[in-house]
């Protein structure tokens, strides 16, 4: 009887572990270019150090990007970004917490491209806003990539842009995110 109970307990534990599958990655890349003329890269920046988690069973996703990991071609711009605009000592991270709509775990078992949407909350510069954007999920081999493009307005996140710089920047800043999860 003990062996049957032990086997049943082990079986339930394994089933729960499989169903509660969670993927984690440190391969989350975020790029933005706030220039009015997108061909100019004066203020463009990228972080390749975001961390993301995907809970397969619940379709929940979370992303954390340390703001000091955004690097610019100009050291002075990077200093202004961290100290004067984003106040990264006070607000060190940008985050997203939400769910993927149109996602199911069976999609991870076969190569393909799937159009999903994400809905949740973005926190940037200490301000949290509701967020919704389309997401392209690409499953290929032993990895899944989530690509998302969206725009934000600096003033929506209480980010003050000085008058001298403001004419050079777009009202809405385009942001591109690419998150790659290894499928183990």
What would you call each of these model-derived segments?
Residues 20-184:
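Low-complexity, acidic/polar, glycine-enriched regions of mature
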